[in-house]
């Protein structure tokens, strides 16, 4: 298996309280990888700790954490009750928010409007042609080609797929009944690709294709993406403001929540938190206390204003203040040999 590894070198000016610099490992979601690449490099410079992260998909990251071979998992899908029952107690730490965009490759089409129902019908294979009357009705000023639609989706266990299909189950009874939500879904037709980079690459190279990716990947490859109608009837593009609007409601204490298709003015409907997930008891697999301390130092660094301000620069959105407060409260429950690490 080929892993997408983001690894940075140790820097000077460490502010780690005098402990020995550590090597941390994580694996999981590719959705936040552009943000994490920046964060891990900066963290090495200010704290002296090295972070190696394998972008293998949320499902793979959760499996690695379950098998206790990483310090943290990255996931765009919070763990289900069943998944948590199969593991020791964990803490979910939202690190930023982002958007799943519906990107497309159509000659001459710079703007496209879609509804959730139409997106569901496309990925279910019920809308097969770009000039379908339902697409034409949403885009009366756009000349859509008489060409077959090529859906592109993830081949690996993916939090991005979970967010996308979670949204579709909320807007399409057909999708909920036939496909449901999950990290892996049996799409009826189209082309599969691994990771957000893989899906974005296929879309960029395939005329008449459409697929779902993290917004940063579409932006990096200059792939256009659709305005999507939200609950309020607004056709919205993702931005820091429209993603933040989706998180304006109440967040539960354990931070496990979906913010797709929320009823809020200006909200982008396929928005999500992305999480780092760690074990509540950090003494496992011969990990040292210093390694546990470095893991929490990384998470505290990500929650800092300095790092949260970076999110918008790489097409994500910062965490709401309340979510940051919940994170710090939850991190104070993390222990090493039963003793809280943060005092």
Regions found by a protein language model. Name each.
Residues 1-2:
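Sec-dependent N-terminal signal peptides
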Residues 5-9:
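C-terminal motif of bacterial Sec signal peptides marking the signal peptidase cleavage site
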Residues 10-343:
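Flexible loop/hinge segments at secondary-structure junctions
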């Amino acid at each position: 298996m080929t892993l997408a590894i983001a690894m940075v070198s140790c820097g000077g000016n460490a502010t780690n309280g005098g402990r020995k610099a550590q090597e941390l490992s994580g694996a999981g979601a590719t959705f936040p990888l552009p943000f994490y690449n920046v964060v891990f490099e900066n963290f090495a410079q200010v704290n002296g700790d090295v972070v190696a992260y394998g972008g293998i998909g949320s499902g793979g990251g959760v499996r690695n954490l379950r098998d206790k071979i990483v310090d943290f998992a990255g996931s765009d899908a919070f763990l289900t009750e069943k998944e948590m029952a199969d593991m020791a107690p964990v803490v979910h730490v939202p690190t930023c928010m982002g958007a799943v965009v519906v990107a497309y490759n159509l000659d001459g089409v710079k703007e496209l409007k879609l509804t959730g129902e139409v997106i569901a019908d496309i990925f279910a294979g019920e809308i097969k042609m770009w000039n379908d009357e339902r697409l034409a009705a949403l885009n009366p000023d756009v000349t859509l080609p008489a060409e077959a639609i090529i859906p592109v989706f993830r081949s690996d266990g993916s939090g991005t797929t979970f967010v996308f299909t979670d949204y579709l189950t909320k807007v399409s009874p057909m999708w909920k009944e036939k496909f449901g939500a999950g990290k892996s879904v049996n799409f009826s037709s189209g082309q599969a690709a691994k990771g957000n980079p893989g899906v974005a690459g296929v879309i960029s190279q395939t005329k008449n294709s459409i697929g779902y990716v993290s917004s940063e990947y579409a932006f990096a490859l200059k792939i256009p993406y659709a305005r999507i109608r939200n609950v309020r009837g607004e056709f919205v593009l993702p931005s820091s403001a429209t993603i933040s609007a989706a998180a304006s409601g109440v967040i539960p204490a354990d931070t496990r929540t979906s913010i797709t298709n929320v009823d809020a003015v200006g909200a982008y409907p396929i928005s999500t938190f992305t999480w780092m997930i760690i074990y509540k008891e950090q003494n496992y697999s011969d990990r040292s206390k210093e390694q546990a301390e470095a893991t929490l130092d990384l998470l505290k660094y990500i929650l800092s204003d300095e790092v949260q301000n970076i999110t918008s620069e790489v097409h994500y959105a910062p965490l709401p203040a309340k979510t940051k407060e919940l994170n710090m409260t939850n991190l104070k429950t993390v222990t090493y040999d039963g003793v809280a690490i943060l005092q």
